[in-house]
UniProtKB/Swiss-Prot annotation:
It is a multi-pass membrane protein. The chain crosses the membrane at residues 29-49, 69-89. Required for the assembly of the V0 complex of the vacuolar ATPase (V-ATPase) in the endoplasmic reticulum. Its main location: endoplasmic reticulum. Residues 50-68 are lumenal. Residues 1-28, 90-104 are cytoplasmic. InterPro entries: Vma21 (IPR019013). The keyword Cell cycle does not apply. One of its GO terms (cellular component) is endoplasmic reticulum-Golgi intermediate compartment membrane. This is Vacuolar ATPase assembly integral membrane protein vma21. It is found in: Endoplasmic reticulum membrane; Endoplasmic reticulum-Golgi intermediate compartment membrane; Cytoplasmic vesicle, COPII-coated vesicle membrane. It comes from Danio rerio (Zebrafish). Keywords: Cytoplasmic vesicle, Endoplasmic reticulum, Membrane, Transmembrane, Transmembrane helix.
Length: 104
């Protein structure tokens, strides 16, 4: 009979680590992701239609074709701003969690 090393019952090489202690961190990450997902969908679309009808056509008096063009540019800029904000928040959240974990 072979003599095996005594190991923990659940320790399998290559098994997934136990993340049950990080539930608060996981919830925080999911809330951030959900917030920016909703913002990424609603802000550019809402900004496009609002700026087209209220800003460019009603206030500035642009034609319909011109207002389509400028409203699309504004919506694309909004997408880039939301993406930049997401990267900034995710970067800072990750470094904060890394610092807190390193101090343990």
């Amino acid at each position: 009979m072979q003599n095996y090393d005594k190991k923990e019952v659940g320790s399998v090489p290559g098994a997934m680590p136990d993340f049950r202690g990080n539930d608060g961190s996981l919830v925080s990450v999911l809330k951030t992701l959900l917030f920016f997902t909703i913002l990424m969908i609603t802000l550019p679309i809402g900004l496009y239609f609002t700026s087209k009808s209220l800003l460019f056509e009603a206030t500035l008096g642009y034609s319909s074709n011109d207002s389509y063009f400028y409203a699309a540019i504004l919506a694309v800029l909004a997408v880039h701003v939301v993406l930049a904000l997401f990267v900034y928040v995710a970067w800072n959240e990750g470094s904060r969690q890394w610092r807190e974990g390193k101090q343990d």
